[in-house]
Amino acid sequence: MTAPKPVVLCILDGWGLRAEREANAVALANTPTFDRLMATCPNATLITHGPDVGLPRGQMGNSEVGHTNIGAGRVVAMDLGAIDLAIEEGTFARNPALCDFIAKVKAKGGTAHLMGVVSDGGVHGHIQHLIAAVEVIAASGVPVVIHAITDGRDVAPTSAGGFVQQLAEALPAGASIGTVIGRYWAMDRDKRWDRVKRASDAMLHGQGERAADAVAAVAAALARGETDEFIAPTVIGSYTGAMDGDGFFCLNFRADRAREILAGLAQPGFDAYDTGRRPDWSGFLGMVDYSTEHDRFMTTAYPKQVIRNTLGEWVASHGLRQFRIAETEKYPHVTFFLNGGKEVPEAGEDRYMANSPKVATYDLKPEMSAPDVSDHLVQAIGEGYDLIVVNYANPDMVGHTGDLRAAMAACEEVDRGLGRAVEAVRQAGGAMIVTADHGNCETMIDPETGGPHTAHTTNPVPVILVGGPAGARLRAGRLADLAPTLLELMGLPQPEEMTGRSLIEA
């Protein structure tokens, strides 16, 4: 048969499946298009967590992991598991980049500043990585100051007190906590530089709220009505800021939410906001690569692996045209992560980024920029592209707020866009796969605490085939199977590096 054109991959970010309707935004929302597709089109479910996406068993997936696996067409071993194993086996302490960092700081008589996520969420960082790094550096005789980034998003919203207590009790002699900062301030990815400045002012200059210790900082924030994600940058004890000769080590192993704060702390020529005088760092280390720009002023403990013949690269190598579209919050995922960590577009790859709305939290505007995404998606479907990849951010980003009604509104807005896309694909004679990278908004109440659930889930996600071959069925699978499925629809062979299997069964 003639290959359909275009073939569209529509990713409903954070749209999981759960049988129970209670606090299930996906089930409770009015989504006539999604419901019709599930009732009339071939569909199945995908696994998005644990070893099926290269993570430790039981570890929930996330957008970076999901899009990396989708684009690779194979299970990609993720940094969380690799770092866990290095710590367990003792090779972390001998990591060449870490040893070089310690030597440089020691030679200058400086202090090592460690910034990391203080939770066991495992999406951007992990408290055990932070503790392990403190132990290694302190054992070398270098003083350590920790910049504790509280989570409340990939874990329960008010769990930071316990994690901070755990960290404080694990600290060896010569190590202390210098600041406590909610990730809202320190881990922005949408150029909200007013937030980032507040975080860097605390780390660089000791400016912000004050507290005697880290546990007291969390308690004071809660008394101010701030849950963990939003804890105002707080300076602990006698901490006064960073000095010339100090070193800085960022322990985040996911790039997107580390880039801005690191640029503010050390990027030469940085001018997005007034940083004040920055120290002459003796060493500036990252757990992973954050971008080619960051590589110019940072060293890396665990450089990224090269993923050859991703979906985008393979499609480009056959002289075909492709289009990527998302709003700001998920734009890196349909470009950088889907392309295996490559910044530069492939030949014939066009992109569009809709600007995410400038609101404090997305429950205030649950439609986000989905209408703009939908407009450009429908336009692209009619423009002769061979492959289109689109991400709707709403179910995930609004799901993270814990607001059920807003999450329902988010799903309804996405469903409207999905309806427009389905009709455009039908008119163009194309085909579409509708799926998600992980779950989120299908669970809005924590079953253990009864409070808001703001994290991702390990629930299965849907995969639906629209406009596929007559009589086709879909089997259950995992995210790595999506690229081979798209290639089959496009009539392209599968590169040998892709070990995923097409989900289409005749």
From Swiss-Prot:
Q: Which Pfam families match?
A: iPGM_N, Metalloenzyme
Q: Where does substrate bind?
A: 124, 153-154, 183, 189, 254-257, 330
Q: What cellular component terms from Gene Ontology apply here?
A: cytosol
Q: Which residues form a coiled coil?
A: none
What are the BP-aspect GO terms?
A: glucose catabolic process; glycolytic process
The cofactor named in the record is: Mn(2+)
* Protein residues bound to Mn(2+) 2: 13, 63, 437-438
What one GO molecular function would you report for this record? Answer: phosphoglycerate mutase activity
In Swiss-Prot or TrEMBL terms, this protein is called 2,3-bisphosphoglycerate-independent phosphoglycerate mutase
